Amino acid sequence: MLMPKRVKYRREHRGRMKGRAKGGTEVHFGEFGLQALESAWITNRQIEAARRAMTRYMKRGGKVWIRIFPSKPYTAKPLEVRMGSGKGAPEGWVAVVKPGKVMFEVAGVSEEVAREALRLASHKLPIKCKFVKREETGGEA
């Protein structure tokens, strides 16, 4: 599971997800990529499930790059606890993803295999995604 080795603060504000992704909008490492069309929090478990789906379909051929990292802690209070008495305990880690961000990249396989592998990965994520090639990404979703 992806998570930071150490952090300065155990809890963070939730923040807002407005606007498009500033960076990471083009396929940089591989030949094909999976680009986000919506904004969301992607948990470390969802990233791992998507990675497993891709590598399983590609039968360990090719190379996969994960371009997002879950660096934001999210908290939750236990079930049936009354309001108040402080913020909840850290529950897990999320990556903040905005529209246009390339989340996964693939190389070393044919386009058909890459397209299907990234389609399977997109089913593990809570947002709409789009398949992109290296030459056609111009930062626009």
Curated annotation (Swiss-Prot):
Biological processes, Gene Ontology terms: translation
InterPro entries in alphabetical order: Ribosomal_uL16, Ribosomal_uL16_bact-type, Ribosomal_uL16_CS, Ribosomal_uL16_dom, Ribosomal_uL16_sf
Top-rank taxon, per record: Bacteria
Keywords for this protein: Ribonucleoprotein, Ribosomal protein, RNA-binding, rRNA-binding, tRNA-binding
Pfam families per the UniProt record, alphabetical: Ribosomal_L16
Family of this protein: Belongs to the universal ribosomal protein uL16 family.
Subunit structure: Part of the 50S ribosomal subunit.
Role: Binds 23S rRNA and is also seen to make contacts with the A and possibly P site tRNAs.
Full protein name: Large ribosomal subunit protein uL16
Species this chain originates from: Geobacillus thermodenitrificans (strain NG80-2)
Lineage: Bacteria, Bacillati, Bacillota, Bacilli, Bacillales
Gene encoding the protein: rplP
